[in-house]
Amino acid sequence: MSKNRLPAYPALANELRSASLGINPAELQGLLTGMLSGGLSLNDKSWQALVFDYTNDGMGWPIGALASAEQILLAMSAQLVDTDFELSLLLPEGEGEEALFELADAVAEWINHFISGLGLSGANLKHASVEAKEALEDLEEMSKLGIDEEDDLAEQAELLEQVIEHIKACVLVLHAEFGVKPEQDTKPTVH
């Protein structure tokens, strides 16, 4: 796993709220992950202007919130190219019915912002492979899912966890197609 760590959801939520930014941690991570998966390079600082335009009417962010966004960007960049294929989604945690509804909403928001990030990065989705198009269609369908108050909440919580795992797989498929690949070592191997 990467040395780069994601910020804690509650602390980041407070930071974004105190900065009066109209985005929550799940949305921010989804947006940045979508941008990376769409081909954004870490060397390309244009992501900041795109995020400012998308979230804050083009106005810059306070230094602390911007540093947290960069922390997410670095962590997700490392996770997306890691050979362990492990992604950590920045989602709220908690117990009980209310927490389950909050999690389901955050999952939908994460997906919607991921798809927006793909678009902001300029990914050419029209020329995507069949696998990438299927992954995108799956994400679009999963973004519409919700929790039914009248069904068994424990069962729905389990299904939501399966959805989250499928989201990760879809993200990896899209990043494999459009994302910037890690630089290959060009030095010859000495035996």
From Swiss-Prot:
GO cellular component: cytosol
Highest rank taxon of the organism: Bacteria
InterPro entries: YgfB-like, YgfB-like_sf
Alphabetized HAMAP family for the sequence: UPF0149
Family, per entry: Belongs to the UPF0149 family.
NCBIfam families associated with the record: PRK01736.1, ygfB_yecA
Protein's name according to its UniProt entry: UPF0149 protein VC0395_A2053/VC395_2591
Species whose genome carries this gene: Vibrio cholerae serotype O1 (strain ATCC 39541 / Classical Ogawa 395 / O395)
